Amino acid sequence: MSNNFKDDFEKNRQSIDTNSHQDHTEDVEKDQSELEHQDTIENTEQQFPPRNAQRRKRRRDLATNHNKQVHNESQTSEDNVQNEAGTIDDRQVESSHSTESQEPSHQDSTPQHEEEYYNKNAFAMDKSHPEPIEDNDKHETIKDAENNTEHSTVSDKSIAEQSQQPKPYFATGANQANTSKDKHDDVTVKQDKDESKDHHSGKKGAAIGAGTAGVAGAAGAMGVSKAKKHSNDAQNKSNSDKSNNSTEDKASQDKSKDHHNGKKGAAIGAGTAGLAGGAASKSASAASKPHASNNASQNHDEHDNHDRDKERKKGGMAKVLLPLIAAVLIIGALAIFGGMALNNHNNGTKENKIANTNKNNADESKDKDTSKDASKDKSKSTDSDKSKEDQDKATKDESDNDQNNANQANNQAQNNQNQQQANQNQQQQQQRQGGGQRHTVNGQENLYRIAIQYYGSGSPENVEKIRRANGLSGNNIRNGQQIVIP
């Protein structure tokens, strides 16, 4: 049994919980009473084996299971006390020792019930104190899960806030073009307004100067004329750019209005000044001149546009008529050349027919000549082939005759040799028959046994005599064969 305390002093300092100790002792007594009751029931029903064998088996089981049961009970008690108050009760240790002292009284119980009791306590121990490593792992996984959830919620909130914020205006190709165009229009309008304001203020200053000083009337008139000239140039520029930009047209109209207002102010200033009467009249005449020049320029432009339209119409008619005339001329030329070609074709067909007939006749005569030549060549080739075949046959017959003659000579020589051999064999047989005996081979006789039978010994000389007398080359003889014995 493992002890988690450093020394006895600290062990004695731990608190004692009487309630848990009483509950534990009651559970142990209840389990022991149930086991005794079950043991008595089974002992009455079962048939016992021999006494010594059962006693030995019971001792072995008690020795193995006793320590396990004590260890499990102590572990369960320690875990319960640590979970409730974090301390250990000394009485639980005493109860564990008391259970150890009470164990021998249960030696009559069968090993089966002891194993059941051990399994129950083991299951309770597994439930009561899980492994600390698993608890730590679970705790760490729970913390990781909480951190992950917090991080995910923060990221989701940031994404939602970004989605709710207004998106930036990205300058794509089309947007850049539109923005640049709008900026350009705004700049032109501002410039026109500034010019009109400057122009208007200049006119007012000229009129005031003309009204206050008679001597400065001429200078005011000159300033007014310069301003008018500048306004005329701006107005002509606006008229030329009227088709390109509507905003510039509006700006030019504002300029003209300011210009008229300036003229009115100049006339009033000229009327108030007595000495500047001539200068005022000049300024009025100069003010009327831009309108006349503007109207004249507009009329001139309209006249030029009208003339251009007429020229365009004339040019369009000429452009339409010129291709038609060219097409008519081309068609006429093609018709003329076509008629000439047809006439030439008709004349050429007649000449071609005559030439074709002459050519056909010449081809026929050539074909006849070639056919004759071919027939002659064929006859010559056939004659030459026949002569060659005859020569080949003659040579072949000669070679066959020579071979036959040679074969006949060889056959005659062979026949003569065979005849001589036969004569020799006959002579030998006659000699043997005249001076020896005959023996018929029976059973498994051989030349060695035959020599022993007739000569008394089977020496190689006697065997060789029999061979020579019968014309044998080896020792092979057969049943029923007649052998001459010399």
Curated annotation (Swiss-Prot):
The chain crosses the membrane at residues 205-225, 320-340. It comes from the Bacteria. Residues 204-225, 233-246, 278-297, 403-431 have a biased composition (Low complexity). It holds the Pfam family LysM. Keywords: Cell membrane, Membrane, Transmembrane, Transmembrane helix. Residues 1-314, 351-440 are annotated as: Disordered. Residues 226-319 are cytoplasmic. One of its GO terms (cellular component) is membrane raft. Promotes binding of soluble elastin peptides and tropoelastin to S.aureus cells although it is not able to promote bacterial adherence to immobilized elastin and, therefore, is not a microbial surface component recognizing adhesive matrix molecule (MSCRAMM). The elastin-binding domain is located between residues 13-33 at the surface-exposed N-terminus, whereas the C-terminus, containing the LysM peptidoglycan-binding domain, is not exposed on the surface of intact cells and presumably remains buried within the peptidoglycan. The presence of the TNSHQD sequence, corresponding to residues 18-23, is essential for EbpS activity but not sufficient, additional flanking amino acids in the amino- or carboxy-terminal are required for elastin recognition. This is Elastin-binding protein EbpS.
